[in-house]
Amino acid sequence: MLSTLPDLHRSFAEQLKLKFQSDSRIHSLLAGGSIIHGGFDQYSDLDFIVVVDPGYYDEVMAQRRELAGTLGHLLHAFTGEHVGEPRLLICLYGPELLHVDLKFVTLEMLTQRVEEPAVLFTRDNTALERQRVKSSAHWPNMTPEWFESRTWIWLHYAVVKLGRGELFEALGMLSFFREQVLG
């Protein structure tokens, strides 16, 4: 699977895998996003799910920025509260820029997932598979009624921004509308 990635991505992913395999606190390393969905290219980011032994979860969460710093030349990292996912660490590595998402979970947390990740390594495949079969991936899709009740307010908001001459805000709202409503 990793062999099909562009050189920069493959090299980073292989290094990350080796690093986490040597850390006894890490139970498994899973890959998601375009690695499993296809369409991966030189501009893609890397999406990883780091399954941590529950006895070390708090420790790893407290040290995750430092841990990310050991994986390469970390330029910056921040957590994913803005997307409703505080377990996510969004990282930018350089000097050749590479965006890497590291989501830290325990085995028990795998029951809530939006995709079926690929296993890059695991210390206990039986435990991992037992947890994965407890539930299936579920994308939190909203009903058409949910979107309909918001559509005109969102479009009005964009029109108001345009009327004020706030062009970037209007473009941002239209982009949001395209992503959330039109898909």
List the predicted regions and their residue ranges.
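A short, charged helix-loop
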Residues: 116-146
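Hydrophobic C-terminal alpha-helix "anchor/cap" residues
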Residues: 19-21, 29, 177
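Conserved nucleotidyltransferase catalytic core and NTase-mimicking acidic/glycine-rich helix/loop elements
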Residues: 136-183
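Metal-dependent nucleotidyltransferase catalytic core
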Residues: 1-24, 35-37, 50-102
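Short gly/ser/thr-rich secondary-structure transition/capping motifs
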Residues: 31-33
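Acidic, glycine- and histidine-enriched catalytic cores of nucleic acid- and nucleotide-handling enzymes
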Residues: 92-128
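Short glycine-biased active-site loop of nucleotidyltransferases that positions the nucleotide triphosphate
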Residues: 37-43
